[in-house]
Every structure is written in C-alpha cells, then in structure tokens.
Amino acid sequence: MVKLTSIAAGVAAIAATASATTTLAQSDERVNLVELGVYVSDIRAHLAQYYMFQAAHPTETYPVEVAEAVFNYGDFTTMLTGIAPDQVTRMITGVPWYSSRLKPAISSALSKDGIYTIAN
C-alpha cells in the first residue's frame, strides 16, 4: 500500500518540475513590457535600420520612454510602464520586419517567461 506521504511527495516533485505558466490578455502591461523589451533590444541591435525607417516615415513617432530606454543600457523596464497597449501594438507591428524578426522574438520571450496570451 502506498503511503499518503509518498503520493504527496510525488505530486510535489511533479509540480516543481513543471514550468509555471500564466495566461494574460494581449493588452496586459506585463505582456507589453516583454514586447517593449524585445523591441528596445531590436532597436539597439539594428539602430541604422530603425533610423532609415524613421526617415522614410516621419509621422511614425516613438514615445520618449522608448528613446530613453534605447540609449540607457541599465534596467530600462521601469521606464516603459504606462505606455498604452494600442501604442505598443502600433509601434511594434508598424515596422516591415515585424513578422520576420520581432514576432518570433516576442513569442520566444513570452514563452520563456511562461506567459501565454489570449486575444482581448
């Protein structure tokens, strides 16, 4: 006969090895911060490409917080709180390399953090 403590220990071991997941709305600020973190990293890695895009599309503006985060190489996540979800979506999806570069990187970062999104 299996002891109750053995069952409890087995359940605890399984729970400890399973990665925690959270399902959030796409507009949740935690999702936006992950997206913006990827976006800022991509801007840093491809700055010339973003400058060329901005020159070709002068009406596409960025919040000052994004510009500050790009050039501040410390912890920038607190700078990015409060940017409206629709503005985050507009910025990220508005560049031609969204599907090829940003979307896969964002999906990977969300998955790594155990975050899955649902449509609003």
Swiss-Prot record:
Keywords: Signal
The name this protein goes by in its record: Seripauperin-8
Cross-referenced Pfam families: SRP1_TIP1 (PF00660)
A single GO BP: fungal-type cell wall organization
Gene Ontology terms, MF aspect: structural constituent of cell wall
Family of this protein: Belongs to the SRP1/TIP1 family. Seripauperin subfamily.
Signal peptide: 1-20
Keyword flag NADP: no
Any single GO CC term annotated in Swiss-Prot or TrEMBL for this entry: fungal-type cell wall
